[in-house]
Amino acid sequence: MYREYIQKTIDLLREATGLEDVMITDGGDHADLASTVSFALAKTQRKNPAVIAGELVAVLSAKPEAKGIEISAKGPYINFIFGGDYVAESVHAARREDYGTLPARTDKVIIEHTSANPNGPLHVGHIRNTVIGDTLVRAFRKAGYPVEAQYYLNDMGRQIAIVAWGVQNLHYDRIPGEKGDEYIVRHYVEANKIAKAKPEIEPEFDLLMEKIEAGDPETVKLFHDSVDICADGIKETLSSMNVVHDKFVRETTFLWNGSMQDVLNRIEKLPIVHHEGQMMYLDLSDEGFGNRYVLRRSNGTSVYAARDLAFHLWKNAQCDRSIDVLGADHKLIGAQLQTTLKLIGERPPEIVHFEFVSLPEGSMTTRGGVFITADELIAETKKRAMEEVTVRRPELGEDEREKIAKAVAVGAVRYDIVKVSAEKSTVFDWKEALDFERQSAPYIQYAHARACSIMEKAKAEGGFAECYEYSDPYELALAKHIARFPYVLEKVVCELRPHLLATYVRDLADLFNSFYRFAPVLKAEGNVRDARLTLVDACRNTLYQALGVLGIEALESM
Protein backbone atom coordinates (compact mmCIF):
# COMPACT_ATOMS: atom_id res chain seq x y z
CA MET A 1 0.00 0.00 0.00
CA TYR A 2 2.95 2.35 0.58
CA ARG A 3 3.61 2.71 -3.16
CA GLU A 4 -0.05 3.53 -3.79
CA TYR A 5 -0.16 6.13 -1.02
CA ILE A 6 3.04 7.75 -2.27
CA GLN A 7 1.41 8.17 -5.67
CA LYS A 8 -1.79 9.49 -4.07
CA THR A 9 0.25 12.07 -2.14
CA ILE A 10 2.18 13.10 -5.25
CA ASP A 11 -1.05 13.52 -7.22
CA LEU A 12 -2.55 15.68 -4.46
CA LEU A 13 0.49 17.94 -4.36
CA ARG A 14 0.76 18.23 -8.14
CA GLU A 15 -2.87 19.28 -8.39
CA ALA A 16 -2.49 21.82 -5.60
CA THR A 17 0.81 23.34 -6.79
CA GLY A 18 0.89 22.84 -10.54
CA LEU A 19 4.43 21.50 -10.22
CA GLU A 20 5.70 18.19 -11.58
CA ASP A 21 8.41 17.74 -8.95
CA VAL A 22 6.70 18.07 -5.58
CA MET A 23 9.83 17.15 -3.60
CA ILE A 24 8.59 14.11 -1.71
CA THR A 25 10.92 12.63 0.90
CA ASP A 26 10.71 10.06 3.67
CA GLY A 27 9.01 11.47 6.73
CA GLY A 28 11.48 9.97 9.18
CA ASP A 29 10.22 9.51 12.74
CA HIS A 30 7.56 12.21 12.44
CA ALA A 31 5.53 11.17 9.40
CA ASP A 32 5.13 8.62 6.63
CA LEU A 33 6.05 11.17 3.96
CA ALA A 34 7.13 14.80 3.84
CA SER A 35 7.39 17.46 1.15
CA THR A 36 9.67 20.47 0.80
CA VAL A 37 7.74 21.87 -2.16
CA SER A 38 7.10 25.13 -0.28
CA PHE A 39 10.74 26.10 -0.87
CA ALA A 40 10.26 25.86 -4.64
CA LEU A 41 7.03 27.87 -4.49
CA ALA A 42 8.63 30.54 -2.30
CA LYS A 43 10.90 31.54 -5.17
CA THR A 44 7.96 32.48 -7.41
CA GLN A 45 5.42 33.57 -4.80
CA ARG A 46 7.94 35.61 -2.77
CA LYS A 47 6.50 34.33 0.49
CA ASN A 48 7.92 32.69 3.57
CA PRO A 49 8.04 28.89 2.90
CA ALA A 50 6.39 28.25 6.27
CA VAL A 51 3.42 30.43 5.27
CA ILE A 52 3.11 28.58 1.97
CA ALA A 53 3.25 25.22 3.77
CA GLY A 54 0.37 26.27 6.04
CA GLU A 55 -1.72 27.41 3.07
CA LEU A 56 -1.08 24.17 1.21
CA VAL A 57 -2.09 22.09 4.22
CA ALA A 58 -5.48 23.85 4.25
CA VAL A 59 -5.98 23.24 0.52
CA LEU A 60 -4.84 19.61 0.62
CA SER A 61 -6.83 18.67 3.73
CA ALA A 62 -10.05 19.87 2.11
CA LYS A 63 -9.72 17.50 -0.84
CA PRO A 64 -11.84 14.29 -0.75
CA GLU A 65 -8.84 12.33 -2.05
CA ALA A 66 -6.99 13.19 1.16
CA LYS A 67 -9.41 11.23 3.32
CA GLY A 68 -7.51 9.00 5.72
CA ILE A 69 -4.32 11.10 5.49
CA GLU A 70 -3.40 13.48 8.28
CA ILE A 71 -1.68 16.50 6.71
CA SER A 72 0.15 19.08 8.80
CA ALA A 73 2.85 21.71 8.52
CA LYS A 74 5.97 21.90 10.60
CA GLY A 75 7.62 25.13 9.62
CA PRO A 76 8.22 24.93 5.85
CA TYR A 77 7.73 21.15 5.76
CA ILE A 78 4.47 19.40 4.93
CA ASN A 79 4.01 16.08 6.73
CA PHE A 80 1.70 13.24 5.73
CA ILE A 81 0.62 10.55 8.20
CA PHE A 82 -1.40 7.67 6.79
CA GLY A 83 -4.33 6.63 8.96
CA GLY A 84 -6.11 3.51 10.14
CA ASP A 85 -7.46 2.43 6.75
CA TYR A 86 -3.95 2.46 5.30
CA VAL A 87 -2.61 0.40 8.21
CA ALA A 88 -5.45 -2.12 8.01
CA GLU A 89 -5.15 -2.51 4.23
CA SER A 90 -1.37 -2.89 4.50
CA VAL A 91 -1.50 -5.62 7.15
CA HIS A 92 -4.24 -7.43 5.23
CA ALA A 93 -2.17 -7.34 2.02
CA ALA A 94 0.93 -8.58 3.84
CA ARG A 95 -0.78 -11.83 4.81
CA ARG A 96 -1.18 -12.90 1.17
CA GLU A 97 1.11 -15.73 0.05
CA ASP A 98 2.48 -13.65 -2.82
CA TYR A 99 3.00 -10.48 -0.79
CA GLY A 100 5.54 -8.18 -2.38
CA THR A 101 5.17 -9.70 -5.85
CA LEU A 102 4.70 -6.83 -8.29
CA PRO A 103 2.54 -6.92 -11.45
CA ALA A 104 4.00 -8.90 -14.35
CA ARG A 105 6.25 -6.92 -16.73
CA THR A 106 7.08 -7.76 -20.32
CA ASP A 107 10.64 -6.37 -20.42
CA LYS A 108 13.08 -9.29 -20.30
CA VAL A 109 16.18 -8.89 -18.14
CA ILE A 110 19.46 -10.81 -18.48
CA ILE A 111 21.77 -10.66 -15.46
CA GLU A 112 25.27 -12.04 -15.89
CA HIS A 113 27.07 -12.73 -12.64
CA THR A 114 29.87 -14.77 -11.08
CA SER A 115 31.47 -15.82 -14.43
CA ALA A 116 34.74 -16.76 -12.70
CA ASN A 117 37.35 -18.44 -14.88
CA PRO A 118 36.94 -22.25 -14.75
CA ASN A 119 40.48 -22.87 -13.58
CA GLY A 120 39.69 -23.68 -9.96
CA PRO A 121 37.16 -23.33 -7.14
CA LEU A 122 35.28 -20.14 -6.41
CA HIS A 123 37.01 -18.24 -3.63
CA VAL A 124 35.85 -15.64 -1.15
CA GLY A 125 36.63 -12.87 -3.62
CA HIS A 126 34.25 -14.36 -6.20
CA ILE A 127 31.23 -14.88 -4.01
CA ARG A 128 30.41 -11.22 -3.48
CA ASN A 129 29.73 -11.18 -7.21
CA THR A 130 27.61 -14.30 -6.79
CA VAL A 131 25.56 -13.00 -3.86
CA ILE A 132 24.94 -9.56 -5.38
CA GLY A 133 24.03 -11.07 -8.75
CA ASP A 134 21.74 -13.78 -7.41
CA THR A 135 19.97 -11.33 -5.10
CA LEU A 136 19.31 -9.05 -8.08
CA VAL A 137 17.98 -12.01 -10.08
CA ARG A 138 15.60 -12.89 -7.25
CA ALA A 139 14.55 -9.25 -6.79
CA PHE A 140 13.76 -8.79 -10.48
CA ARG A 141 11.71 -11.99 -10.50
CA LYS A 142 9.78 -10.88 -7.42
CA ALA A 143 9.25 -7.53 -9.13
CA GLY A 144 7.49 -9.26 -12.01
CA TYR A 145 10.23 -9.33 -14.66
CA PRO A 146 11.11 -12.32 -16.85
CA VAL A 147 14.75 -12.86 -15.89
CA GLU A 148 17.56 -15.06 -17.15
CA ALA A 149 20.66 -15.56 -15.00
CA GLN A 150 23.75 -16.20 -17.13
CA TYR A 151 27.30 -17.35 -16.43
CA TYR A 152 29.80 -16.39 -19.17
CA LEU A 153 32.15 -19.36 -19.36
CA ASN A 154 35.70 -18.55 -20.40
CA ASP A 155 36.65 -21.69 -22.32
CA MET A 156 39.55 -20.44 -24.46
CA GLY A 157 41.70 -17.79 -22.77
CA ARG A 158 45.31 -18.08 -21.65
CA GLN A 159 44.41 -19.33 -18.19
CA ILE A 160 42.35 -22.12 -19.74
CA ALA A 161 45.25 -22.93 -22.06
CA ILE A 162 47.39 -23.42 -18.94
CA VAL A 163 44.71 -25.71 -17.48
CA ALA A 164 44.55 -27.68 -20.73
CA TRP A 165 48.34 -28.01 -20.84
CA GLY A 166 48.28 -29.31 -17.26
CA VAL A 167 45.59 -31.88 -18.01
CA GLN A 168 47.44 -32.93 -21.17
CA ASN A 169 50.84 -33.31 -19.51
CA LEU A 170 50.43 -34.01 -15.80
CA HIS A 171 47.90 -36.86 -15.90
CA TYR A 172 46.75 -36.55 -12.28
CA ASP A 173 44.30 -39.15 -11.01
CA ARG A 174 41.04 -37.90 -9.55
CA ILE A 175 41.00 -38.33 -5.76
CA PRO A 176 37.82 -40.08 -4.53
CA GLY A 177 35.30 -37.44 -3.48
CA GLU A 178 37.29 -34.65 -5.10
CA LYS A 179 35.16 -31.96 -6.73
CA GLY A 180 35.83 -31.12 -10.35
CA ASP A 181 37.09 -27.62 -9.60
CA GLU A 182 39.47 -28.99 -6.96
CA TYR A 183 40.80 -31.53 -9.47
CA ILE A 184 41.37 -28.90 -12.17
CA VAL A 185 43.06 -26.37 -9.90
CA ARG A 186 45.77 -28.93 -9.04
CA HIS A 187 46.70 -29.00 -12.74
CA TYR A 188 46.51 -25.22 -13.04
CA VAL A 189 48.67 -24.46 -10.02
CA GLU A 190 51.32 -27.04 -10.93
CA ALA A 191 51.42 -25.89 -14.57
CA ASN A 192 52.07 -22.33 -13.39
CA LYS A 193 54.87 -23.54 -11.11
CA ILE A 194 56.47 -25.43 -13.99
CA ALA A 195 56.16 -22.41 -16.31
CA LYS A 196 57.81 -20.20 -13.71
CA ALA A 197 60.71 -22.64 -13.36
CA LYS A 198 60.89 -23.40 -17.10
CA PRO A 199 59.85 -20.32 -19.14
CA GLU A 200 60.67 -22.24 -22.32
CA ILE A 201 57.29 -24.02 -22.12
CA GLU A 202 55.37 -20.73 -22.50
CA PRO A 203 55.18 -21.12 -26.32
CA GLU A 204 53.26 -24.36 -25.74
CA PHE A 205 50.49 -22.34 -24.09
CA ASP A 206 50.49 -19.97 -27.07
CA LEU A 207 50.24 -22.91 -29.48
CA LEU A 208 47.22 -24.29 -27.62
CA MET A 209 45.55 -20.87 -27.86
CA GLU A 210 46.17 -20.76 -31.60
CA LYS A 211 44.77 -24.29 -32.01
CA ILE A 212 41.59 -23.59 -30.05
CA GLU A 213 41.00 -20.45 -32.10
CA ALA A 214 41.49 -22.43 -35.30
CA GLY A 215 38.94 -24.99 -34.08
CA ASP A 216 41.34 -27.94 -33.98
CA PRO A 217 39.01 -30.82 -32.91
CA GLU A 218 41.45 -32.48 -30.51
CA THR A 219 42.28 -29.18 -28.80
CA VAL A 220 38.62 -28.17 -28.63
CA LYS A 221 37.81 -31.45 -26.87
CA LEU A 222 40.72 -31.00 -24.44
CA PHE A 223 39.63 -27.46 -23.55
CA HIS A 224 35.93 -28.25 -23.27
CA ASP A 225 36.42 -31.41 -21.22
CA SER A 226 38.70 -29.55 -18.79
CA VAL A 227 36.33 -26.60 -18.51
CA ASP A 228 33.27 -28.81 -18.03
CA ILE A 229 34.93 -30.74 -15.19
CA CYS A 230 35.72 -27.49 -13.40
CA ALA A 231 32.30 -25.96 -14.14
CA ASP A 232 30.59 -28.98 -12.56
CA GLY A 233 32.45 -28.29 -9.33
CA ILE A 234 31.60 -24.59 -9.48
CA LYS A 235 27.91 -25.45 -9.95
CA GLU A 236 28.04 -27.60 -6.80
CA THR A 237 29.39 -24.64 -4.83
CA LEU A 238 26.77 -22.30 -6.26
CA SER A 239 24.00 -24.77 -5.44
CA SER A 240 25.21 -24.98 -1.83
CA MET A 241 24.69 -21.20 -1.65
CA ASN A 242 21.15 -21.43 -3.12
CA VAL A 243 22.34 -20.08 -6.49
CA VAL A 244 21.31 -21.46 -9.88
CA HIS A 245 22.15 -20.04 -13.31
CA ASP A 246 19.67 -20.49 -16.13
CA LYS A 247 22.36 -20.63 -18.77
CA PHE A 248 26.11 -21.15 -19.04
CA VAL A 249 27.30 -19.42 -22.23
CA ARG A 250 30.61 -20.52 -23.78
CA GLU A 251 32.99 -17.81 -24.94
CA THR A 252 34.03 -19.90 -27.97
CA THR A 253 30.45 -19.68 -29.29
CA PHE A 254 31.06 -16.13 -30.51
CA LEU A 255 34.35 -16.99 -32.17
CA TRP A 256 33.03 -19.91 -34.17
CA ASN A 257 29.56 -18.65 -35.11
CA GLY A 258 31.02 -15.61 -36.88
CA SER A 259 29.47 -13.03 -34.57
CA MET A 260 32.84 -11.83 -33.24
CA GLN A 261 34.07 -11.19 -36.77
CA ASP A 262 30.80 -9.41 -37.55
CA VAL A 263 31.32 -6.95 -34.71
CA LEU A 264 34.97 -6.43 -35.71
CA ASN A 265 33.81 -5.65 -39.25
CA ARG A 266 31.50 -2.97 -37.86
CA ILE A 267 34.28 -1.54 -35.71
CA GLU A 268 36.58 -1.42 -38.76
CA LYS A 269 34.40 1.40 -40.12
CA LEU A 270 35.13 3.66 -37.15
CA PRO A 271 37.66 6.44 -37.83
CA ILE A 272 39.49 5.65 -34.58
CA VAL A 273 40.44 2.08 -35.57
CA HIS A 274 44.15 1.39 -36.16
CA HIS A 275 46.30 -1.52 -37.33
CA GLU A 276 49.90 -2.56 -36.75
CA GLY A 277 50.46 -5.64 -38.84
CA GLN A 278 47.68 -8.00 -37.80
CA MET A 279 47.07 -6.13 -34.56
CA MET A 280 43.80 -4.17 -34.42
CA TYR A 281 42.98 -1.59 -31.78
CA LEU A 282 40.78 1.42 -31.08
CA ASP A 283 42.15 4.78 -30.01
CA LEU A 284 39.77 5.71 -27.20
CA SER A 285 41.82 8.64 -25.91
CA ASP A 286 39.08 11.12 -26.88
CA GLU A 287 36.69 9.06 -24.72
CA GLY A 288 38.90 9.45 -21.67
CA PHE A 289 40.73 6.12 -21.88
CA GLY A 290 44.19 5.01 -22.91
CA ASN A 291 44.86 5.15 -26.62
CA ARG A 292 44.90 1.39 -27.22
CA TYR A 293 41.87 -0.85 -26.80
CA VAL A 294 43.25 -4.00 -28.44
CA LEU A 295 40.77 -6.26 -30.26
CA ARG A 296 43.19 -8.52 -32.15
CA ARG A 297 46.75 -9.57 -31.31
CA SER A 298 49.80 -9.16 -33.51
CA ASN A 299 49.71 -12.89 -34.35
CA GLY A 300 46.14 -12.55 -35.65
CA THR A 301 44.40 -14.26 -32.72
CA SER A 302 41.43 -12.60 -31.06
CA VAL A 303 41.30 -11.24 -27.53
CA TYR A 304 38.69 -11.51 -24.79
CA ALA A 305 37.39 -7.98 -25.44
CA ALA A 306 36.36 -8.82 -29.02
CA ARG A 307 34.46 -11.91 -27.96
CA ASP A 308 32.89 -9.99 -25.07
CA LEU A 309 31.54 -7.38 -27.49
CA ALA A 310 29.93 -10.15 -29.56
CA PHE A 311 28.50 -11.71 -26.40
CA HIS A 312 26.83 -8.44 -25.45
CA LEU A 313 25.34 -7.94 -28.91
CA TRP A 314 23.92 -11.47 -28.65
CA LYS A 315 22.44 -10.65 -25.24
CA ASN A 316 20.94 -7.41 -26.53
CA ALA A 317 19.03 -9.32 -29.19
CA GLN A 318 17.36 -11.42 -26.48
CA CYS A 319 16.51 -8.88 -23.78
CA ASP A 320 15.35 -5.38 -23.01
CA ARG A 321 17.75 -4.83 -20.13
CA SER A 322 21.24 -6.31 -19.79
CA ILE A 323 23.03 -6.16 -16.44
CA ASP A 324 26.60 -7.25 -15.66
CA VAL A 325 27.98 -7.70 -12.14
CA LEU A 326 31.72 -7.00 -12.17
CA GLY A 327 34.49 -6.43 -9.66
CA ALA A 328 36.01 -2.99 -9.18
CA ASP A 329 39.13 -4.22 -10.99
CA HIS A 330 36.99 -4.45 -14.14
CA LYS A 331 35.92 -0.79 -14.14
CA LEU A 332 38.20 0.14 -17.04
CA ILE A 333 37.32 -2.95 -19.07
CA GLY A 334 33.62 -2.38 -18.43
CA ALA A 335 33.78 1.29 -19.41
CA GLN A 336 35.71 0.48 -22.61
CA LEU A 337 33.09 -2.14 -23.50
CA GLN A 338 30.23 0.30 -22.90
CA THR A 339 31.93 3.04 -24.93
CA THR A 340 32.69 0.77 -27.89
CA LEU A 341 29.11 -0.50 -28.03
CA LYS A 342 27.85 3.09 -28.03
CA LEU A 343 30.25 3.99 -30.85
CA ILE A 344 28.71 1.33 -33.09
CA GLY A 345 25.18 2.36 -32.12
CA GLU A 346 24.42 -0.50 -29.73
CA ARG A 347 22.95 -0.48 -26.22
CA PRO A 348 25.62 -0.84 -23.53
CA PRO A 349 24.96 -3.03 -20.50
CA GLU A 350 24.26 -1.63 -17.07
CA ILE A 351 27.16 -2.54 -14.83
CA VAL A 352 27.08 -3.11 -11.08
CA HIS A 353 30.66 -2.76 -9.84
CA PHE A 354 31.52 -4.09 -6.42
CA GLU A 355 34.50 -3.69 -4.14
CA PHE A 356 36.00 -6.79 -2.65
CA VAL A 357 35.24 -8.92 0.37
CA SER A 358 38.13 -10.31 2.35
CA LEU A 359 38.85 -12.27 5.49
CA PRO A 360 41.06 -11.17 8.37
CA GLU A 361 43.24 -14.21 7.57
CA GLY A 362 45.41 -13.79 4.49
CA SER A 363 44.93 -13.14 0.80
CA MET A 364 43.32 -15.12 -2.02
CA THR A 365 44.94 -15.93 -5.33
CA THR A 366 44.27 -18.93 -7.57
CA ARG A 367 47.49 -18.72 -9.58
CA GLY A 368 49.70 -19.16 -6.55
CA GLY A 369 47.52 -21.85 -5.05
CA VAL A 370 47.02 -19.85 -1.83
CA PHE A 371 43.34 -19.06 -1.43
CA ILE A 372 40.32 -19.65 0.77
CA THR A 373 37.60 -21.30 -1.27
CA ALA A 374 33.92 -20.54 -0.99
CA ASP A 375 33.44 -24.18 0.03
CA GLU A 376 35.90 -23.74 2.89
CA LEU A 377 34.23 -20.52 4.00
CA ILE A 378 30.79 -22.14 4.09
CA ALA A 379 32.14 -25.26 5.83
CA GLU A 380 33.85 -23.20 8.53
CA THR A 381 30.76 -21.02 8.97
CA LYS A 382 28.59 -24.13 9.24
CA LYS A 383 30.95 -25.62 11.84
CA ARG A 384 30.72 -22.47 13.96
CA ALA A 385 26.94 -22.29 13.46
CA MET A 386 26.65 -25.93 14.58
CA GLU A 387 28.48 -25.08 17.80
CA GLU A 388 26.07 -22.22 18.48
CA VAL A 389 22.96 -24.26 17.63
CA THR A 390 24.16 -27.10 19.88
CA VAL A 391 24.52 -24.69 22.80
CA ARG A 392 21.10 -23.16 22.17
CA ARG A 393 19.18 -26.34 21.29
CA PRO A 394 20.94 -29.35 22.84
CA GLU A 395 17.66 -31.30 22.91
CA LEU A 396 17.47 -31.47 19.11
CA GLY A 397 18.76 -34.49 17.21
CA GLU A 398 21.98 -34.14 15.26
CA ASP A 399 20.23 -34.22 11.86
CA GLU A 400 17.94 -31.36 12.87
CA ARG A 401 20.85 -29.35 14.25
CA GLU A 402 22.80 -29.99 11.02
CA LYS A 403 19.87 -28.74 8.95
CA ILE A 404 19.55 -25.56 11.01
CA ALA A 405 23.33 -25.00 11.01
CA LYS A 406 23.51 -25.26 7.22
CA ALA A 407 20.68 -22.77 6.72
CA VAL A 408 22.22 -20.42 9.28
CA ALA A 409 25.68 -20.69 7.68
CA VAL A 410 24.51 -19.96 4.14
CA GLY A 411 22.31 -17.17 5.41
CA ALA A 412 25.16 -15.70 7.44
CA VAL A 413 27.52 -15.66 4.46
CA ARG A 414 24.96 -14.26 2.03
CA TYR A 415 23.62 -11.61 4.38
CA ASP A 416 27.01 -10.42 5.63
CA ILE A 417 28.06 -9.88 2.01
CA VAL A 418 24.89 -8.27 0.65
CA LYS A 419 24.22 -5.96 3.60
CA VAL A 420 27.09 -3.68 2.55
CA SER A 421 26.63 -1.32 -0.39
CA ALA A 422 28.41 -2.78 -3.44
CA GLU A 423 30.75 0.19 -3.84
CA LYS A 424 32.19 -0.34 -0.35
CA SER A 425 34.76 -2.99 0.49
CA THR A 426 33.98 -5.32 3.38
CA VAL A 427 35.67 -7.84 5.66
CA PHE A 428 33.74 -11.00 6.47
CA ASP A 429 33.68 -11.47 10.24
CA TRP A 430 32.49 -14.87 11.49
CA LYS A 431 31.60 -13.62 14.97
CA GLU A 432 29.47 -10.77 13.66
CA ALA A 433 27.88 -12.81 10.86
CA LEU A 434 26.77 -15.55 13.28
CA ASP A 435 25.61 -13.29 16.12
CA PHE A 436 22.06 -14.37 17.01
CA GLU A 437 21.59 -11.27 19.16
CA ARG A 438 22.61 -8.62 16.64
CA GLN A 439 21.72 -7.50 13.15
CA SER A 440 22.79 -10.59 11.20
CA ALA A 441 21.06 -13.29 9.17
CA PRO A 442 20.62 -15.58 12.21
CA TYR A 443 19.08 -12.63 14.07
CA ILE A 444 16.57 -12.13 11.24
CA GLN A 445 15.95 -15.87 10.84
CA TYR A 446 15.31 -16.06 14.58
CA ALA A 447 12.71 -13.27 14.31
CA HIS A 448 10.90 -15.35 11.68
CA ALA A 449 11.12 -18.48 13.83
CA ARG A 450 9.76 -16.52 16.80
CA ALA A 451 6.80 -15.32 14.71
CA CYS A 452 6.14 -18.92 13.61
CA SER A 453 6.27 -20.07 17.23
CA ILE A 454 3.75 -17.43 18.30
CA MET A 455 1.37 -18.49 15.53
CA GLU A 456 1.72 -22.16 16.50
CA LYS A 457 0.94 -21.38 20.13
CA ALA A 458 -2.08 -19.31 19.09
CA LYS A 459 -3.32 -22.21 16.98
CA ALA A 460 -2.94 -24.57 19.94
CA GLU A 461 -4.96 -22.14 22.05
CA GLY A 462 -7.85 -22.17 19.59
CA GLY A 463 -6.72 -19.69 16.96
CA PHE A 464 -7.81 -16.08 16.53
CA ALA A 465 -10.16 -13.88 14.53
CA GLU A 466 -8.73 -11.47 11.97
CA CYS A 467 -8.64 -7.94 13.33
CA TYR A 468 -6.97 -4.85 11.88
CA GLU A 469 -7.41 -2.22 14.58
CA TYR A 470 -4.13 -0.66 15.70
CA SER A 471 -3.27 2.27 17.95
CA ASP A 472 -0.25 1.19 20.01
CA PRO A 473 2.95 2.89 18.72
CA TYR A 474 4.81 -0.43 18.49
CA GLU A 475 1.96 -1.92 16.46
CA LEU A 476 1.87 1.07 14.12
CA ALA A 477 5.64 1.20 13.62
CA LEU A 478 5.74 -2.48 12.69
CA ALA A 479 2.66 -2.34 10.45
CA LYS A 480 3.92 0.70 8.55
CA HIS A 481 7.33 -0.87 7.98
CA ILE A 482 5.68 -4.04 6.68
CA ALA A 483 3.79 -1.86 4.19
CA ARG A 484 7.06 -0.64 2.66
CA PHE A 485 8.28 -4.04 1.41
CA PRO A 486 6.98 -3.74 -2.20
CA TYR A 487 8.33 -0.18 -2.39
CA VAL A 488 11.80 -1.28 -1.25
CA LEU A 489 11.76 -4.14 -3.76
CA GLU A 490 10.95 -1.70 -6.58
CA LYS A 491 13.76 0.56 -5.41
CA VAL A 492 16.24 -2.34 -5.47
CA VAL A 493 15.52 -3.18 -9.12
CA CYS A 494 15.42 0.46 -10.22
CA GLU A 495 18.69 1.40 -8.53
CA LEU A 496 20.43 -2.03 -8.63
CA ARG A 497 21.21 -1.73 -4.91
CA PRO A 498 20.38 -5.04 -3.17
CA HIS A 499 21.76 -3.85 0.17
CA LEU A 500 18.60 -1.74 0.51
CA LEU A 501 16.58 -4.93 1.00
CA ALA A 502 19.10 -6.25 3.53
CA THR A 503 18.71 -3.04 5.52
CA TYR A 504 14.92 -3.21 5.25
CA VAL A 505 14.63 -6.77 6.57
CA ARG A 506 17.08 -6.08 9.40
CA ASP A 507 14.96 -3.09 10.46
CA LEU A 508 11.84 -5.25 10.18
CA ALA A 509 13.36 -7.79 12.59
CA ASP A 510 14.29 -4.96 14.96
CA LEU A 511 10.75 -3.55 14.92
CA PHE A 512 9.24 -6.99 15.41
CA ASN A 513 11.46 -7.70 18.40
CA SER A 514 10.55 -4.34 19.96
CA PHE A 515 6.87 -5.05 19.34
CA TYR A 516 7.25 -8.53 20.88
CA ARG A 517 8.92 -7.05 23.96
CA PHE A 518 6.58 -4.13 24.62
CA ALA A 519 3.24 -5.26 23.17
CA PRO A 520 2.24 -8.65 24.64
CA VAL A 521 0.54 -10.87 22.07
CA LEU A 522 -0.67 -14.15 23.53
CA LYS A 523 -1.34 -12.60 26.94
CA ALA A 524 -3.47 -9.83 25.44
CA GLU A 525 -7.24 -10.19 25.35
CA GLY A 526 -10.12 -9.71 22.94
CA ASN A 527 -9.61 -7.58 19.84
CA VAL A 528 -6.15 -6.52 20.98
CA ARG A 529 -4.98 -10.16 20.99
CA ASP A 530 -6.60 -10.84 17.63
CA ALA A 531 -5.14 -7.70 16.04
CA ARG A 532 -1.65 -8.45 17.33
CA LEU A 533 -1.78 -12.05 16.13
CA THR A 534 -2.93 -10.78 12.74
CA LEU A 535 0.05 -8.42 12.73
CA VAL A 536 2.46 -11.19 13.76
CA ASP A 537 1.20 -13.29 10.86
CA ALA A 538 1.73 -10.39 8.45
CA CYS A 539 5.25 -9.87 9.78
CA ARG A 540 6.03 -13.59 9.56
CA ASN A 541 5.03 -13.62 5.90
CA THR A 542 6.93 -10.43 5.09
CA LEU A 543 10.08 -11.81 6.70
CA TYR A 544 9.60 -15.03 4.72
CA GLN A 545 9.18 -13.19 1.42
CA ALA A 546 12.09 -10.80 2.01
CA LEU A 547 14.47 -13.56 3.14
CA GLY A 548 13.49 -15.50 0.01
CA VAL A 549 14.60 -12.60 -2.19
CA LEU A 550 17.89 -12.54 -0.27
CA GLY A 551 18.33 -16.28 -0.93
CA ILE A 552 18.16 -17.08 2.78
CA GLU A 553 16.03 -19.87 4.24
CA ALA A 554 13.31 -18.65 6.59
CA LEU A 555 13.55 -21.21 9.39
CA GLU A 556 10.43 -22.07 11.37
CA SER A 557 12.44 -23.31 14.34
CA MET A 558 15.94 -22.48 15.58
Curated annotation (Swiss-Prot):
InterPro entries: aa-tRNA-synth_I_CS (IPR001412), Arg-tRNA-ligase (IPR001278), Arg-tRNA-synth_N (IPR005148), Arg-tRNA-synth_N_sf (IPR036695), ArgRS_core (IPR035684), DALR_anticod-bd (IPR008909), Rossmann-like_a/b/a_fold (IPR014729), tRNAsynth_Ia_anticodon-bd (IPR009080). It is found in: Cytoplasm. SUPFAM superfamilies: Anticodon-binding domain of a subclass of class I aminoacyl-tRNA synthetases, Arginyl-tRNA synthetase (ArgRS), N-terminal 'additional' domain, Nucleotidylyl transferase. Keywords: Aminoacyl-tRNA synthetase, ATP-binding, Cytoplasm, Ligase, Nucleotide-binding, Protein biosynthesis. Its EC number is 6.1.1.19. SMART domains: Arg_tRNA_synt_N, DALR_1. PROSITE patterns: AA_TRNA_LIGASE_I. It catalyses: tRNA(Arg) + L-arginine + ATP = L-arginyl-tRNA(Arg) + AMP + diphosphate. Pfam families: Arg_tRNA_synt_N (PF03485), DALR_1 (PF05746), tRNA-synt_1d (PF00750). One of its GO terms (molecular function) is arginine-tRNA ligase activity. One of its GO terms (biological process) is arginyl-tRNA aminoacylation. It is an enzyme of class 6 (ligase). It comes from the Archaea. A motif ('HIGH' region) lies at residues 116-126. The keyword Thylakoid does not apply. Belongs to the class-I aminoacyl-tRNA synthetase family. HAMAP family: Arg_tRNA_synth (MF_00123). This is Arginine--tRNA ligase. The lineage of its organism: Archaea, Methanobacteriati, Methanobacteriota, Stenosarchaea group, Methanomicrobia.
